[in-house]
């Protein structure tokens, strides 16, 4: 026979009053959490929703029909696609080494990537001038290759790479780290070389995470502004087009270009997120 000790009634509590059942408390906590999450979700989406209320298809069409209005879109797409290619070619090996390598100064590598992430973009632009500007040794070397890292498409790509690379490298590192190393070891036991095991095992399993990292980097590159305005004021991409239109003709004229930037930048991250979520669901199932 077991005995239960009844808690003493507290101030204002009738001696026979029962404590609130645990399920009720859990339901109240869940409802409060859901309400808080809904408030945060609405607050985060508020600016986007507001933009759709203030911009109509007619205003977007009218803005894009203006002479030269499509040039910033073409420049942004061209620079963004080249930036993604650079990130995949250079950032993926670095991310793999950070996740799998046994480098003696691995923490130093990670600290360098984090430092570039935490630097304000405007500061990045200023530092790039002193690193790759025309009067620097690197700038002079680039000049021999007929490349200029200021006010050119090449300069825009450099700025976008510096602003977006940390997002891709850290995201790709997390994607590689999430793959169980024992899968690679099993492939090696079956006779696969490390490079073949990476292609057949690691990359397919890490692909959703890599796609998500690349999509975030794409959005970051498309919206790059701080470093761009310092070293690549020309040719205009969409962010600078929004800025100059705002300065010259006002907020109402800049909003259509803001909507175009969202339409170009956001679909890839959304698609990558849905693919990643589906892949996680398949693994759990």
Annotate each language-model stretch with its function.
Residues 1-27:
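Short, Lys/Arg-rich, polar N-terminal cytosolic tail immediately upstream
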Residues 3, 24-58, 67-177, 201, ...:
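Membrane-water interface segments at the C-terminal ends of transmembrane alpha-helices
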Residues 104, 193-194:
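Short coil/turn motifs that cap or connect alpha-helices
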Residues 179-183:
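Short glycine/proline-centered loop/turn elements that form peptide/ligand docking sites
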Residues 187:
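The alpha-helix within a helix-turn-helix
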Residues 190-192, 204:
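Glycine/proline-centered hinge or cleavage motifs at structural transition points of membrane proteins
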Residues 233-247:
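Short hydrophobic, aromatic-rich alpha-helical segments embedded in or entering the lipid bilayer
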Residues 281-285:
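Short, charged juxtamembrane terminal tails flanking transmembrane helices
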């Amino acid at each position: 026979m077991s005995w239960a000790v009844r808690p003493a009634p507290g101030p204002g509590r009738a001696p026979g009053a029962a404590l609130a059942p645990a399920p009720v408390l859990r339901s109240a906590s869940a409802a409060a959490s859901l309400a808080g999450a809904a408030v945060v979700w609405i607050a985060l989406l508020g600016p986007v929703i507001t933009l759709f209320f203030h911009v109509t298809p007619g205003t977007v069409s009218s803005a894009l029909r203006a002479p030269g209005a499509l040039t910033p879109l073409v420049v942004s797409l061209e620079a963004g696609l080249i930036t993604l290619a650079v990130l995949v070619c250079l950032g993926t090996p670095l991310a793999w080494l950070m996740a799998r390598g046994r480098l003696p100064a691995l923490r130093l590598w990670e600290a360098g990537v984090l430092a570039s992430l935490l630097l304000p973009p405007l500061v990045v632009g200023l530092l790039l001038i002193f690193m790759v500007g025309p009067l620097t040794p690197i700038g002079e070397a680039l000049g021999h290759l007929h490349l200029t890292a200021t006010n050119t498409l090449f300069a825009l790509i450099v700025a976008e790479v510096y602003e977006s690379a940390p997002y891709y490298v850290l995201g790709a590192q997390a994607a590689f780290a999430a793959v169980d190393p024992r899968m690679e070891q099993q492939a090696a036991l079956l006779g696969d070389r490390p490079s073949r095991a990476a292609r057949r095992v690691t990359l397919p399993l890490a692909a959703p995470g890599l796609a998500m990292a690349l999509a975030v980097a794409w959005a970051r590159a498309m919206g790059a502004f701080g470093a761009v305005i310092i070293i690549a004021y020309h040719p205009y991409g969409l962010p600078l087009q929004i800025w100059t239109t705002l300065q010259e003709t006002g907020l109402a004229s800049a909003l259509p270009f803001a909507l175009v930037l969202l339409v170009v930048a956001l679909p890839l991250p959304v698609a990558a997120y849905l693919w990643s979520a589906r892949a996680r669901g398949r693994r759990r199932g």
